[in-house]
């Protein structure tokens, strides 16, 4: 009898050797990733066939449902026939999206992935803002799309090698290998997926696009001669300046005046005094970033009884939903996940890598979420990486000493996570003092000085907020609150990932100007 083996298929109840991919585990992993990222409706698009591979993919999807304590009746599976025109296939995908209203979609084939992109374009849907995607088969073009696609990656080369080995074993009558052998298949995460954030009080985040003003509301705003006060924790950064510009540009459209802008210099006591001054100005609304969630809470509570409060980044402790209008923030879960994933990808080829975490450590909701999710993605997705040290700096000026002590105590650290750019600059200064510029730095927020360090190779990657967009979003929420009670409680803005070689483009996207000459522009 001529020796033969089955590749990616097998004869049911037969003893013929087969080389397979574990589709059940792969699609369970992809579906679970979306559930863990806050998605409720995850649509699975699969080709309409009778193959065992399709059944395994569906079984993996359904297992993820059960593991997430969901019933099979909540499944969103659409079987799509590929034996029709591309336009008809796209139309059927669009119908499935309209039926299930997913925030995330997984495809079971590479042609389905391409046709899904076509369908989303025709629907005017943005990926990942409106719908996140995990495609199938990590083709070369998957990194070239906008955004680059997350995919279930199959190691075809390994499958061919296993198949060749199994076939030669049979030809040479060697001892039988296992009946089924599996080639590697795993999830590759890029920029086509997003994490759905929750607000400080558990509210699901909505996009700034969910707020709109009618013609009548705009007219009411211009007639109202409204006044707004701004209380910032600190204004001495480009981040704060861009927030202020976004706020000013948006409010000016509706004739709303900014009567004061306060800078607390990260001092809760000073901010409390400034809030007393704001009270005497009797503004129609206040935009604020608390410098400390606990210490400023009572002062903000008192202010909430006389005016509308719209917060940036975080809400003071002991506030309930009736105490403020809305909170606008970068999606901090995604911000941290992006940074953690960059560390993971940087070190993924190391057999065993060690990382240090220099976290904020203060009572600040946004940075706590960010730091925790950076750690979470490393622990769950990169088993070769060990977090050997984790310490909070509390006050920015402490970051230098914390880094100095951490690297001295753990000299085998290969990369550092630092909560945001200003403490990261002090940590880099400590690394230079120790002559340890071999340690890669990853952080959040883009500014001139951190861009300089990225240009010089110290910072390998960062995830940044979109401060101008966030400023416009908070101003729009304020404007809406002056003429309507229909304002979302939590508005999340998607962060922006910056790799070393993408600094020029990122600078233009974030700051709306060309990269300065000093940075290579």
Identify the meaning behind each predicted range.
Residues 1-26, 111, 137-149, 293-334, ...:
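Flexible loop/hinge segments that line or gate small-molecule binding clefts
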Residues 17-44, 59, 85-94, 113, ...:
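Hydrophobic alpha-helical segments within soluble ligand-binding/sensing domains
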Residues 30-69, 179-192, 228, 232, ...:
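An alpha-beta-alpha
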Residues 227-246, 259-269, 277, 281, ...:
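Extracytoplasmic "Venus flytrap"
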Residues 235-237, 266, 292-294, 315-319, ...:
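Solvent-exposed loop/turn segments at secondary-structure junctions
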């Amino acid at each position: 009898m001529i020796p033969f083996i089955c590749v990616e298929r097998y004869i049911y109840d037969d003893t013929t050797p087969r080389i397979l991919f574990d589709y059940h585990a792969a699609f369970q992993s992809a579906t679970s990733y979306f559930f863990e990222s806050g998605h409720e409706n995850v649509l699975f698009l699969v080709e309409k066939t009778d193959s065992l591979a399709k059944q395994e993919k569906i079984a993996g999807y359904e297992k993820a449902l059960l593991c997430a304590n969901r019933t099979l009746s909540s499944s969103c599976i659409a079987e799509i026939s590929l034996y029709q025109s591309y336009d008809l296939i796209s139309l059927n995908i669009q119908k499935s999206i309209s039926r299930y209203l997913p925030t995330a979609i997984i495809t079971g084939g590479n042609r389905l992935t391409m046709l899904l992109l076509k369908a989303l374009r025709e629907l005017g849907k943005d990926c990942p803002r409106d719908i996140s995607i995990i495609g199938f088969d990590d083709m070369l073009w998957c990194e070239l799309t906008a955004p680059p696609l997350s995919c279930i990656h199959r190691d075809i080369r390994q499958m061919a090698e296993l198949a060749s080995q199994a076939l030669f074993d049979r030809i040479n009558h060697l001892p039988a290998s296992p009946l089924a052998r599996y080639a590697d298949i795993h999830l590759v995460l890029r920029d086509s997926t997003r994490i759905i954030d929750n607000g400080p009080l558990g509210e699901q985040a909505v996009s700034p696009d969910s707020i709109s003003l009618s013609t009548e509301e705009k007219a009411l705003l211009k007639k109202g001669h409204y006044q707004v006060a701004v209380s910032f924790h600190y204004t001495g950064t480009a981040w704060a300046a861009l927030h202020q510009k976004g706020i000013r540009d948006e409010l000016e459209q509706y004739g709303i005046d900014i009567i004061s802008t306060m800078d607390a210099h990260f001092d809760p006591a000073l901010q409390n005094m400034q809030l007393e001054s704001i009270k005497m100005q009797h503004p129609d609304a206040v935009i604020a970033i608390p410098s400390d969630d606990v210490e400023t809470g009572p002062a903000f509570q008192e202010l909430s009884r006389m005016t509308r409060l719209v917060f940036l980044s975080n809400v003071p402790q002991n506030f309930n939903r009736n105490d403020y209008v809305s909170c606008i923030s970068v999606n901090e879960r995604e911000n941290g996940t992006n940074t953690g994933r960059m560390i993971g990808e940087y070190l993924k080829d190391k057999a065993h890598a060690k990382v240090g975490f220099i976290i904020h450590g203060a009572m600040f909701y946004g940075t706590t979420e960010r730091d925790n999710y950076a750690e979470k993605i490393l622990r769950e997705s990169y088993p070769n990486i060990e977090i050997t040290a984790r310490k909070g700096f509390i006050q920015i000026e402490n970051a230098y000493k914390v880094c100095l002590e951490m690297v001295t105590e753990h000299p085998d650290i290969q990369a550092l996570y630092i909560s945001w750019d200003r403490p990261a600059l002090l940590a880099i200064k400590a690394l230079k003092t120790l002559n340890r510029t071999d340690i890669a730095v990853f952080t959040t927020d883009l500014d001139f000085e951190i861009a300089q360090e990225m240009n010089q190779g110290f910072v390998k990657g960062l995830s940044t907020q979109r401060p101008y967009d966030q400023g416009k979003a908070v101003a729009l929420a304020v404007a809406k609150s002056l003429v309507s009670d229909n304002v979302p409680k939590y508005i999340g803005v998607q962060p922006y990932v910056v790799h070393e070689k993408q600094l020029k483009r990122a600078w233009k996207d974030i700051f709306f100007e060309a990269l300065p000459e000093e940075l290579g522009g």
